[in-house]
């Protein structure tokens, strides 16, 4: 078994290798002045079981293309099996045709991964679970919930309500509420556009409660901060947010700085610089991904990785 990494999140890749007990594979990735990428595998991979760690986070197109080139290089070097480890799956929000003449880009990415020579995909907290069905190869879909739970249980939170910031996240919120033995609520919203919310309402009892907002990803933080604001007006004692993938562009960072969210709990699936003025706790999923890689390599079951106290995450 050998583990390689693109440039998207080498910090996570090194942590995964440490948890497995192996060295990160030697690879030369060089950008050309015209924007093209050159890749050379610097060690023998003939007959090897290969894992490539590359979240397709922003810059999404660059990281995707880099991944395809690495896969092609490994395939042409006679690797036995190639598993693409995508801690974050880019384009996951484009998972359906919701208006005329638009693509289903999440499916296109799946097609391109298979065409490039991948034999298996390992990913985490897909924005839309049906993306697993876009592939004609095995997909192992992990969840950050067990890592989040281990952190949250140490807080010994009382009067807790788990809140989904929209209708789409109710399944995730329900799993958290069952595990944490907490009440469940939802913020129902009506959108003007993909980036603008017209109105919001809270369904559930919030007054005097400690609130935990849960979501799979945030970029502009509009949904999170708007939900937190209305929860505070409804009498929430405190508001924390658990988000698996915190992509956080400049708009999102500024919104969080001005928000009433007391703590944002996220993971290291995507790499980002330190952010001043925002209370962010970053939990590592390196151990979880590392264990999955070991089990896939040994052809063992990964079923137990979907489970944590309170039941399954799926």
List PLM regions with ranges.
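PRPP-associated nucleotide enzymes
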Residues: 1-314
């Amino acid at each position: 078994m050998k583990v390689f990494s693109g440039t998207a999140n080498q910090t996570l890749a090194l942590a995964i290798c440490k948890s497995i007990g192996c060295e990160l594979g030697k690879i030369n990735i060089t950008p050309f002045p015209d924007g093209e990428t050159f890749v050379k595998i610097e060690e023998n991979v003939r007959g090897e079981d290969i894992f490539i760690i590359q979240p397709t986070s922003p810059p999404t197109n660059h990281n995707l293309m880099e991944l395809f080139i690495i896969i092609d290089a490994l395939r042409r070097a006679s690797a036995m099996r190639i598993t693409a480890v995508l801690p974050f799956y880019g384009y996951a929000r484009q998972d359906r045709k919701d208006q005329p003449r638009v693509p289903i880009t999440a499916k296109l990415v799946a097609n391109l991964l298979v065409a490039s020579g991948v034999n298996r995909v390992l990913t985490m907290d897909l924005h839309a679970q049906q993306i697993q069905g876009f592939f004609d190869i095995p997909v192992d879909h992990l969840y950050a919930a067990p890592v989040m739970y281990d952190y949250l249980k140490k807080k010994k939170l009382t009067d807790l309500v788990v809140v989904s910031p929209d209708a789409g996240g109710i399944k995730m919120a329900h799993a958290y509420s069952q595990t944490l033995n907490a009440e469940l609520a939802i913020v129902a919203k009506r959108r003007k556009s993909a980036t603008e919310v017209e109105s919001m309402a809270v369904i559930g009892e919030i007054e005097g409660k400690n609130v935990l907002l849960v979501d799979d990803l945030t970029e502009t933080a509009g949904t999170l901060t708007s939900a937190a604001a209305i929860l505070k007006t409804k009498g929430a004692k405190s508001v924390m947010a658990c988000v698996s993938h915190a992509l956080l562009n400049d708009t999102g960072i500024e919104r969080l700085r001005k928000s009433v969210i007391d703590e944002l709990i996220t993971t290291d699936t995507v790499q980002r610089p330190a952010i001043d003025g925002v209370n962010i706790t970053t939990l590592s999923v390196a151990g979880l991904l590392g264990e999955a890689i070991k089990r896939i390599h040994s052809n063992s079951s990964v079923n137990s990785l979907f489970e944590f106290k309170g039941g399954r995450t799926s």
